[in-house]
Each structure stands twice: as structure tokens, then as C-alpha cells.
Amino acid sequence: MQNNKNYTEKFITDKVTRRDYSKIKSNFEGPNLLEIQVESFKRFMEKDLKEVISGIFPLKSPQGKYTLAFKGLKIKQPTKDESACRDEGKTFETPIYIDLELTDNYTGEVKRAQRNAKTGEDGIYLGAIPKMTEKGTFVINGIEKFVISQIVRSPGIYVLGKSSIKLNGSRKRLFEGKICEIYPSKGTLMLGYIPKDRHNIQIVARDSSGDNAQTFSITTLLKAFGLTSAEILKIFNNEKEIRESLEVEKYSPEYIFENSQENEIIFKIYSDAHDIHEKADRRESNNKLREEYIEQGSPLLSKLKELIFDYVEKSDEIDALLHENKDVEDANFIKNNKKLYDEREEIINCIISEKAAKDIVELLGINIKNVETLRHLGKASYQLALQQHFFNKRLYDISSAGRYKFEKKLLLSERLYQKVIARDIIDKKNNILIPKDTLITKEHIELIKKESRDKNIKWTRKINLLPIALETEIEQFLEYESIAVYKDNDLRDETTEIVGLAPGCKLQTLTVADLVATTSYIYNLNYEIGEFDDIDHLGNKRLKLIHELLRARIATSMARIEKFINEKLAISDGSSNNITNVNDKGIDTELDREVEESDMSDEEKKKAISVKSIINTKQFQSLVKDFFNSHQLIQFIDQQNPLAELTNKRRISAMGPGGISREDPNLDIRDVHHSHYSRICPIETPEGMNIGLIMSLASLAKVDENGFIVAPYYVVEDGVVKEECKYLTAHEDDNYIIAESSVQLDENKRILDEQVVARYRGSTGLFSPHEVDFIDIVPKQVVSIAASAIPFIENDDGARALMGSNMQRQATPLIKPYAPIVGTGTEFKIAHDSGMAVVAKNDGVVEFVDSQKIVIKNDNDKLDEYKLIKYRKSNQDTCNNQIPIVKIGQKVHKSETIGDGPAMQNGELALGRNILVGYTTWRGYNFEDAIIISERLVDQDVFTSIHIDEHTIQCMKTKNGDEEITRDMPNVSDTAKRFLDNQGIVLVGAEVHEGDVLVGKTTPRGNVETAPEDRLLQTIFGDKSKTVKDSSLKVKHGQEGIVAAVKRIKSTDENGSELPDDVIEIIKVYIVQKRKIQVGDKMAGRHGNKGIVSKVVPIQDMPFLKDGTPLDIMLNPLGVPSRMNIGQILELHLGYAAAEIGKKQLIQIAIDQLGYEKYISLFGINEIIAKKLYEKITNLIKHKQAKQPKDIDLIDITIVLKELGLSYDDIGIKISTPVFDGANHDDIVDIMNEANIDIENNKGKQVLYDGRTGEAFDGLISVGLTYMLKLDHMVDDKIHSRSVGPYSKITQQPLGGKSQNGGQRFGEMEVWALEAYGAAYNLLEILTIKSDDVQGRNQAYNAIIKGHDVVADGMPESFKLLTKQMQGLGLCITVETKDDRMIDINEYTLNQNRLNNDDDEVIFDESIKEINENNQQVFNTDFNDNDYDDEENF
């Protein structure tokens, strides 16, 4: 055999070997493709669930008598397994129990919840949370669902040129300029900006009502948080913008006590305090009057009053000393009494701080209810209210992602690049790390990051807050870093102070240091220090995964439970004021006062509260249930095939709660961004309104703990590629030079190229290998898993590649799936991680195998049993069936595939079949992308698939009596119930058709009074038609198949099935259909080349090759050039060459006596068949005395294969040509030469002969093997006709759509067509008796069944509507009869209706009667999604 060096043999499994034509070899093992779902839910169950539940505890009663503490959480195993939940329509869920301890603080008595009598578990049953299955889905009410990941804007700080604040009523306040947007996960959005033509920095924030956006100075906010003017100027080194901001505001000692409208309250308190101080004759009296005055009015003013009284007293003390020392010079007096002056200055600064806090609280409408509850502690203040609003995680949360973003934006190390520093950077030992006047480079930045992280640089300072700000005891972060840089790198004459956040902050709330650093960032922008953010950059977006969505939902439920517990504790405490308690995670509410224990009788003590009596868990249960049943991001899993299921779980949506609407026309949101590289696939997205809003993760992308999408790269040091791999976020990408994976490397992995193409900050350029920091892993990391399964995608137009990616997800699993001969190497990974394959959990040896289960003895001598799924219905009604691919005695390894699922072959994805295709026209049948197929594809079940429909019926308890499952239904023909057994249930194996009864059921009618003689006759003849009505389950319109299984679920079953109270029994009937390929079915390749089957041609009439091989499919060659998907042509030639080589190697292996094992690994065939095949081929070689493959005739091989049940579909070497790194032109030429295909003369094309005439076609034709798929859009689901059927109650027109047995809409333009042809009678019928002429259609139906002529003389409902509208305009409408009489239209209509109702011979269709009886008013006349194909057949 010829051995080319441009490929390697890649052993994928024992039965699969592929020729790998990739040029870039990598041992990198990508992440598990389901990791995004599984790891997220694991994090929720192991960490988040306990955090959220325990977060509301301990809770204390208002009087301090009771304390409810959290002691533990128990997560139990589900009571039913997955399959039982699926069969019974239950939820696969895990029960949650919490251990709570109620302590009576007066008596010391401790109570806990007693053991649950029903479950035998200790603790309080909180509820049940659906458990994720191993393949990343949830079973909810028997249906598999999953959570789609939502891409949202990340909390953090953003620098923008334009921003807006949304107000109520869809209003917005727009701002332009240099804006710093502080965007929290929960809390008030704030914008810091410098107005045009001014230098003072302002803050804009939306008030709590949402009606307006309030503006105030940044220094006002800093003062409100406890900074003085002097401290602010010191931090910012007297910057001009800060000075102007201080000058604009009125919060200074000069203005604070002036009699103005802004300071009215301060002035009044100051005047009152002065009066009280002067009136008091002694100190005790002064204190008493002071306390009385402070306690009056709002509790939040008490702190302000207290400070003003202190100020007045301190001022009087200084004035008294001044009077005593009036001979002393002022300067000396102040020097001698500096402490007194400092104390007074601190007091006045505290007053300013409290006044600023008060103004902001009132301006923003901050809720002060929680703060007022602290009046007993003397802690209530506006300072506390403001800090609670911004520094309490329950009210203001930036999340871990927000903290990460704050640090990335505000650290000094992120802002000094390419700036000249104006001060030395000194370490703690006073060594100069970087001298002044140095231009900061990348190397300097890395040094600064390291030393700053280790706290080794002497530029860290602490913000000094006023005592009033520290009294709140709320955790703060006050460290910042600062350094001066030159405003202009060249002139170096003026400096500006850069103030940054110090590293190490772990708080997930806003901090004073954050505000200080943000203020610096705003004015630094004037000197081009810092950079504006691109809001569409992926570094500014993050994913909300299942753990975050569930955490938020459970936090809501726990907040409601907390409120309920507080109310109960307040009542049990005997507290009359019923104060809402706030736990110690928000405001410390521990009351330091003693309350006497109330006298309780012995009877009352027995009825004392228990743990169960003060907690109500219904909120938890209802919110969790509501989340999994109705949340926008919970969707049915697409189980069309393994690729569809896997792609579903890796999908990203920008829509959903708080997301983007599909009607939003913004193209920037939908467009591909450079930061998507290796993170989000630029190809795979839906067509239509959702384009760009629904995306897919790239094939190697993961999600980090903060929700940012990260991509892997190899580390490069000094031009050498290391084995170390790092995952980088999109923002980290921008800081490094990242080369493409296609660079040339030597054996030591040193980059050989003098210049390499690399990316830096969104731009591509040439760089030296020593400048490169990272290198891509493999080229395919750019695209999603679906796109990476398309060979030669680099040769396809983007729009066609998009269609190819989407249509692979629509491929229907076939009964004989074959993996593609021309693959990309990702087929195994996709099938393995999809969750549909059977994967070994441990190393071991196979002990037992059959069609139902696999038993493996692991290395610990324990048996692992794997039950195989057999013919289970999927969400898309396809057949989910698993087949073992191991044998007894085989050694298997952990994570090895041991069983194939649907659309798999030997562990590889197998969505379709390798088909011999010719690009030629044939009698016009493949016009406009139509596809001509050979009858072989029908006869040999090449594209045959199995579909399973589930039909369910419930036997209910009704107010008139119980329903009954029976074979004896009234008014049902024997033909319709011929397949029922004695109990009235269809027999398994019966071939049923439309209208056949599957389960017989009767429902009692209401009380119907009958004469005694009628009841006697009913008893004698067994006539039940008057007492019960037929409500059987029948085969729906247009359906047929074979009954595969019947499941009966009763509430009295031994397995303990739990059914609703009014349900006696549920019966499920599964009908299987075997669908062969037929005219009208949709087929497609992997390159976006799709079409509808237009003709099935007999094998003998199909064009054939020179050796007599007939084509399987003929495609229109005009479908290639304009679509620019040339990848299909490369696949065509490569596939044909691989198939030809397979035929050669089939013989060569036997000639070389390499053994039958080579057949197994090369062709993936069964061991027994491989032995027989090897034996027969060996005998054939001996008989023919062959020395080389060409000595054996093709017909002899065909006969041998047919004897063993094989075909050429089973013989062919497999190729792996990864996307962007696969077989090139030279490789294809080499492999075609190896297959003895004439390239020089025929360019790989073939002479085709007409099967009808035997003559050769003019010109050479491209023929080869293409991987074709049968899509879910099948004609059996779409074709539909209606004779009689249901009508809409409102319009009296036929319903629309196949699902409602509706008709075909005849619209305005269709009417024009009939008018153009003059087809008056056809038009009359269509607009009257076939539409909404009730009387006319009944008469027509009557006439047809009696064989009379049809006369349509009724009045359509639409004409009646027209007359009513004309009457509404004040017009008189009359009808003129034959005898010239004028009748009012209303009278005429009534007469017509009376005639219609009196007609005894009117015969109604059964379906119409049923709709009227059951009063099922159908208003929706839209088509069902499955009734038409919404895609263009281009």
C-alpha cells in the first residue's frame, strides 16, 4: 500500500481509524462540552443553595425573646429515578430539609423540628429542587428541559461617550461627554461625568420612584460618606476639577448655618439648640431639655440634632474661654486651645456630612424604613441610611464579576501604560523600583502588578473618614493608591494625580475607595489617561448560568419566608408594634434591653410556639416550580439528534428577562465582534429575527467563576511554545499579543518565522516571535461544535456555512446510520459528550452484554450495570435507541464509549449517509434545487427513519361519576375498535390508521330524565348511549403506524405511582412509524446545500458510471457557483477517492495477509463478519491468483459483500480534515492519484451514461461521495387535505392548519386569479359554501350525500357583517324580492336563520358536532409550526 507522509493514522476507537490531514498537531484535550451546564448546577447545589438559605438567619423577635438559628441543610436523593419520572409525568427532583433551632432567650429552652411522620426525616421540609441529569437536563413533569445561558451586560464601571438612564414610561435621560457609569447587578445606576464647558464633576442617579434622574456634585457624595473637604483635596492633590466641584456645592462651614432655604432645618435646629442652651440654668437641666428635643420628630434627625447641640456647646465653651483670656492674642489663644478648635471643626464636618447624606437620601427617595427601626439603639441617621443603600449587599450588589471589572478598570497598574510618571515608584525598603520621568512599558506594568499585589510599593494610603461614618459598623474598604504623571509625555510641564483602587478588596458592594478612584478616572480622561469602553466587547458581557438564575429565584423565596417568620415571631413575642426585623446580614438589630417574661398559664405554655408553626415553605415550593415551568430561559431540549441536543446546551441567548427584544433593530448588538474570537461562534446563529441574538459557544470555550467566557491559548516565552495552557477572558486578550496556530515550529516548538501574524487589541499585524505572548491551540477553536463538523468550511460562503450548521441539527436519525467518510475529527467528541452515548464510568472488563444492558466488572471487583435505552420517544418524536458496541471480555477504560445512541456509529456522530452523487441535470426534475434520488435509497432503507408518537388519555373522576376504560362504547363501529382487547386497550403490534380507537373510554352524562319504559329497554338491550358518551382515544387525523408499547399508570400500583386526586388511571400508547424517503421530503448536505426530493427514479433509469455503478442522487450543478459553497465539491472528490481506496485496501489487506483485525479498525465492521469477509476475499484471491487489487473484478467483490449483508457503503477509508487546517489541494491530488482517478485529463470528473438509452452524456460530470442528511421537514408531517371539519365559532370560517384539520386559506390575491379566468361558479363556491355560508354548506352537504344537485343560496356570515357595518354608518339596508317587495335586512336574516334551524334534514359532520357539544371555541386560526417549512429552499 502507498504511504503518503502528508497524513497520519489516527486511532479514534478500536473500530475507527481515520487519516488525519491536519497540519497542526496538538494533544490538547478540550473541556467536556456539557461542562457549562453540569458544573454550574453542581456549584449551586454544593455552595449557593446553602449560602442563600442560611443567609436570612439568625432571626430575632422584636423584643429579643426568641432566636431562630440555622443549623444545617440536608439534600436527599430523589424518591424516583429518571425513567420512572419520565413515564409517570413526574419531576425528577431532590427533597431539601433544613435544620432550624428555636431558642427562648429568657428560659434557655431550645426547640427543633420533630421527625416527619410521612418521610421519616428530621428537620423542616423546605421543598424539592429538580435535579440535573448526567447529561445536563431536567425532567420536569416527564419532559426533558434545559436552561439556556443568558448573555447580559456585566456589572462594573464603564467609560462611555454617551449614556442614558431609563425612567418610567419608556422615557430616557441622555448624557454625552466623558461619562463613568457605575453599573451594579442590583441597586442604583449612577453616572459620573463632567458637563460640557465646565470642570466640576457631577453624579447623576435615578431616584427610587423612577420618575426622574437627580444630579449632585461628586464631592457632595464623598462628604456624605464621611470625607472632609481637606481630605478630598489631599487625596486628589488639589486637582482643578476637584476644587471647582467643592466651590460649586454649598457644603462648607461658611454656608452650613446660614438662613437659607437649603439649610432651613439646620438653621432651625441651630436656633433651638442655642435657645435651649441659653435658657438652661444648670447642666442637668440642659441635658434633660436636650434629650427631650432630640427625641422629638423623625428618628433620623436625632443624629443631626445631637451634633448641632455638641457644636453649640463647644462654641459656647470656646467663647467663654475667649472672654476669660481676652488679653491673649488670637493666634496664641488658638494655638493654646488647638484641641478645642479641632474638636469643633470635626463636629461641624460631621454636621456637613450628615446634611449631605440627608439631602442625597431625600433626593433619591431612599427607603428609610429599615433605619428607623434602630431608633432604640440611637443609631438611626441619614449617614446610616445612605450607607445601607450603597454598602449593604442585600440592597446594592456588584457581584464578584463587578468587583473583577472594578479592579480591571481602576487599579493603577491598568492605567499607567504609555504614561511618564512624575514621581519615583519606591518599595517598602525605600528602593526605587521605577525612577521618575520613566515611560511605563509592558514590562513595567507586569512589575507593578506583582509588587502591588504583594503590597510592596509605598503608594498605598488610607482614606480618613469622620467618626460619624465609622459609627455605622458597616464593613468598608478605604485603601487607595496614587501617583503623579505628566499630562503631556513630551512637554512634561504639568502633572495630574492618578488615584487608583488598592488591590485586595473582596467586598461585592460599592466602597468609598471605588468612588474615589472613579472620580480620578473621570478627570484623568481630560489628559487621555484611561480609555473608553466598547459596550459590545465580550469583556463587558457575561453569562448568567443556571446557578445564578436559581440563586436569584430562591433568594426571592427566602426573603418572603423571612418576612413571614418575622411576623410570626413578633406575634409570639407579644410585641404590639409588630416591627419588621432586619437580620444581622443587613442591619444589626440586636436589642440591648430587658423585657420581663409575661405571665403564662400552664395551658398557654403547652401551646407555646414551635419551629414548624413559625415557618411557611409554600413560597419556596411555588417559586421553584414556577421557575422550571414558566421562566423564559427554561426550554424544551431539542432531541432531534445528538448534535442538536449538545448545541442546545451550549447555546447563548441575549433575550430573556432584562435582555434584548427580538424586535430591536440594533445591528451592533447582533454583529460579530473581534472579541468573539474563540469564545462565540461567528457562524452558527438562526436566520430571521433572532439572528445575532441567539449564539453558540465556540468549541473550546469555557465559562469562568465570574461568568465571563474564556478561551484557551498556549503560553509562548522567548519565541518558544510551552505545553502550559491558559484560559483568558476577552479583556485579558487585549493585553497580549496572540499568534495564530498556523506558525511554523521546529522540533523544540520554537517559532521559525521571522515575522508572525498575530492579534493585539482587536487588530491584526506582523510581530517578532519574541514579542508573542500566546498562541492559538488549534484553528477550529474559532467556531462552534456544529460548524467544526463541516469539512472544508473555509471554502464555503458564510451564509451557507450558517445554514449547514443549522441543518445538521435538523437531521433525522436513520435506522442504518453511517459516520461520514470525509469527517473533521470532531465526530467522536460530539457523540461522546452529547449525553446520548453510553460511557464507561470506570476502568474494567465487560462481563455481560445484550441489547438491554451492559455489565462491566471494574478494577475494584464491583459490577457496573448500564441499562440501555430502547425505543424511547424523544421530545421531537424521533426514536432514541442505544446499541452496545463492546463484546464480552473486552477491556474498557473510564470515559470510553461502550454503547451507541441514535445517529451514531462506533462512537462517532452519524447524522446521514455517504451517497454517490452526480452534479447534472436530468429532464428538468432537479430544477431550482430539487433533488432526484434513486429507488435504491427507498428499497434498501438508506434514508429510512423511525418516529414515535405518544398518545395519552386520562381516566378521571367526574361529578357525574367515574369514567371507565371499556371496549363497549356507544355509537362506535366494530371496525374502529377491531384492535382493542377485552379491557378496551389496543393490542401491541396492531397496525392502526386514522380514526381507529386506541383506548376505549366512556364518560357519564349529566342527569338525563328518561321514561321508565326507556330505562327498561336500555337495560334489556344494553344501550348505554343515553347515560354515557364516547370519549375514547383515537388515532388523530393524518396519522398511522404500529403500536409499539402501552403503559398503564394507576394510583394503586405497587411502585407507588402518585397521580392527581381526580385521576384514576393514565394510559399511554406509543405508535411507531417507519418513514422511507419519498417525494416531498427535504434533504441537505453539510454545506448549506438543501433541496426537496422531486422524483424517485428506478435504479435502471439512473445515470451510471463506466463500471456500471448507478448514481444515488442527482443535484443541480447551478446550485454551486452562485451559492459559493465550494466545500461540497472538495468533499465530493475526496469522498470518492477514499471510497475507491477502500475497495483497493479491502483486497490489499488480504493479499498482504494482515489479518481480519485490520478490517475491523479500518472499516468498523463486526468481528464475526470481518472474519468471514477476510476468509472469502482470501479465497477469491487464491482462485483468481491475484497479485494486486486490479486483478479482482468489481462484480466479484460486490457479490462477496452482498452475501455478507454488506455494501460499498461499509467499505471506505475514513478521512479527518479539520476545519481551517484540513486537506489542501495537493493532499486531494495525492489521494486521488492513490485511488487511480484520472486528474490530468478529466480533472477528477467522470463519463456518465444515461440509464434509459445507454448513451454517454455530453461532457464530463462531477461524481463522488457526499454526506447527505434527511431533515426533519418531512412531507408526511406537512401534506394535508380537508373535506369537512371544524369551523371558527366567531367567523364561521374553516379553521387553518393541519393540527386543527383546517382548510387552505383562499386570500384576496387568489380571488383575483379566479376573477381573471372568469371562473364565476368556482369563485361563488369558495366564497360561500366552502367558507362561511352556514345554511348553504349544510344544504350542500345534504345534497351531496343524497346525490342531488348542489344549490348554494345562503348568505355568508361576512356579508352579514358588512351589512351591520353599513347600518352602523346610518345606512338603511333592504332586500328586494322577486315580486319587488322590500324587506329589511334584519328581518331577512332572521327568516333565513329560522329556515336553517327548522331544516330537519341538515346533517352535521361529527367533528363539528363534537366541537359544539364540548363547547370548544377555537379562536386561533394560525397555522401550526409543523404545518409549513419556513425556510427557503435555496
Curated annotation (Swiss-Prot):
Transmembrane segments: none annotated. InterPro entries: DNA-dir_RNA_pol_bsu_ext_1_sf, DNA-dir_RNA_pol_bsu_external_1, DNA-dir_RNA_pol_su2, DNA-dir_RNAP_su2_dom, DNA-dir_RNAP_su2_hyb_sf, RNA_pol_bsu_bac, RNA_pol_bsu_CS, RNA_pol_bsu_protrusion. Pfam families: RNA_pol_Rpb2_1, RNA_pol_Rpb2_2, RNA_pol_Rpb2_3, RNA_pol_Rpb2_45, RNA_pol_Rpb2_6, RNA_pol_Rpb2_7. It is an enzyme of class 2 (transferase). Keywords: DNA-directed RNA polymerase, Nucleotidyltransferase, Transcription, Transferase. GO terms for cellular component: DNA-directed RNA polymerase complex. CDD domains: RNA_pol_B_RPB2. One of its GO terms (biological process) is DNA-templated transcription. The keyword Transferase applies. Its EC number is 2.7.7.6. PROSITE patterns: RNA_POL_BETA (PS01166). One of its GO terms (molecular function) is ribonucleoside binding. It catalyses: RNA(n) + a ribonucleoside 5'-triphosphate = RNA(n+1) + diphosphate. It comes from the Bacteria. DNA-dependent RNA polymerase catalyzes the transcription of DNA into RNA using the four ribonucleoside triphosphates as substrates. The RNAP catalytic core consists of 2 alpha, 1 beta, 1 beta' and 1 omega subunit. When a sigma factor is associated with the core the holoenzyme is formed, which can initiate transcription. NCBIfam families: PRK00405.1. Belongs to the RNA polymerase beta chain family. HAMAP family: RNApol_bact_RpoB. This is DNA-directed RNA polymerase subunit beta. It comes from Ureaplasma urealyticum serovar 10 (strain ATCC 33699 / Western). The gene is rpoB.
